[in-house]
Amino acid sequence: MIETDMLYAHVKLKDWLKPTAEKLLRRIAQGEFGVVATSREVLHELYYVSMAEGVELDSYISRLAALTSIPNLSFRETTAEIDLLAATLMKQFRLSSIFDAYYAATALNAVADHTIISTDEVFDKVTGIRRIDPRNM
């Protein structure tokens, strides 16, 4: 599973993670990892981050179109179980971001290997999740 940091870096014009994101998403598009999951919540987080950065709505829509058209990237829907698990993970592991909690819950509930590709070390403290830093792939 891949979370927002790589996807957001991919759609931004400039980002310190953009070279890593471009390489990783090219590999995903080519099918090197099979189908890679992500949470549909990344689209919501992308909205809030984009608006906070002053991105125009048309640009946000273009970003969504770019992400949702990546071959071999599958957006996982949230479920009531994922919603409840996300809130529980926030409490149990003191996660401050609801989005990180959703990604962790999705990885635990809807991704067979419970792996998250992310630079965010917050996932290291969630029992059952294996984080892979994309800069090391």
Predicted regions, residues:
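Alpha-helix C-capping/helix-to-loop hinge sites
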Residues: 10, 31, 49-53, 70-74, ...
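Histidine- and aromatic-rich ligand-binding microenvironments
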Residues: 3, 37-39, 95-97, 120, ...
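A generic structural signal for short hydrophobic patches within well-formed alpha-helices
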Residues: 7, 43, 123-124
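Active-site neighborhoods of divalent-metal-dependent phosphate/nucleic-acid chemistry enzymes
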Residues: 73-115
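Short, conserved active-site loop motifs that form the nucleotide-linked donor/cofactor pocket
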Residues: 34, 73, 129
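Acidic, PIN/NYN-like endoribonuclease modules and their adjacent C-terminal/linker elements
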Residues: 104-137
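Short, well-structured N-terminal submotif of metal-dependent ribonuclease cores
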Residues: 1-38, 50-62, 137
